[in-house]
């Protein structure tokens, strides 16, 4: 006879913690438990972009929070609506990863 297995919440493991109920976005971790923050080189390496992937929820809220906390110009941070990625002009990979970890992701 088959016994029905019901998942118990205490037995489940999550890839990342939920930072706060007030956040309107969530950044999931990769399968290797890393934050999905990457560098992208354009125009033969002369243009460097920082990409934040795996955003669930309001990516524009993440953009606005990054602008205010990292003191960046609003024209240097934008959302790619097609891929749902936040793009920052320049190499900000270390500061973005530290900020995401401080937020609980």
Curated annotation (Swiss-Prot):
UniProt keyword Transmembrane present: no
Q: Which domain of life is it from?
A: Eukaryota
Keyword Ribonucleoprotein belongs to the record: yes
Q: Which GO terms describe its biological process?
A: mitochondrial translation
| Record's GO cellular component terms | mitochondrial large ribosomal subunit; mitochondrion
What keywords tag this UniProt record?
Mitochondrion, Ribonucleoprotein, Ribosomal protein, Transit peptide
Q: Where is the transit peptide?
A: 1-15
Tell me the compartments it is located in: Mitochondrion
- A GO MF term: structural constituent of ribosome
What family does the database annotate?
Belongs to the mitochondrion-specific ribosomal protein mL49 family.
Q: Which PANTHER family match?
A: LARGE RIBOSOMAL SUBUNIT PROTEIN ML49, MITOCHONDRIAL 39S RIBOSOMAL PROTEIN L49
Function, in words? Component of the mitochondrial ribosome (mitoribosome), a dedicated translation machinery responsible for the synthesis of mitochondrial genome-encoded proteins, including at least some of the essential transmembrane subunits of the mitochondrial respiratory chain. The mitoribosomes are attached to the mitochondrial inner membrane and translation products are cotranslationally integrated into the membrane.
Record note on quaternary structure: Component of the mitochondrial large ribosomal subunit (mt-LSU). Mature yeast 74S mitochondrial ribosomes consist of a small (37S) and a large (54S) subunit. The 37S small subunit contains a 15S ribosomal RNA (15S mt-rRNA) and at least 32 different proteins. The 54S large subunit contains a 21S rRNA (21S mt-rRNA) and at least 45 different proteins.
**Protein name per Swiss-Prot or TrEMBL:** Large ribosomal subunit protein mL49
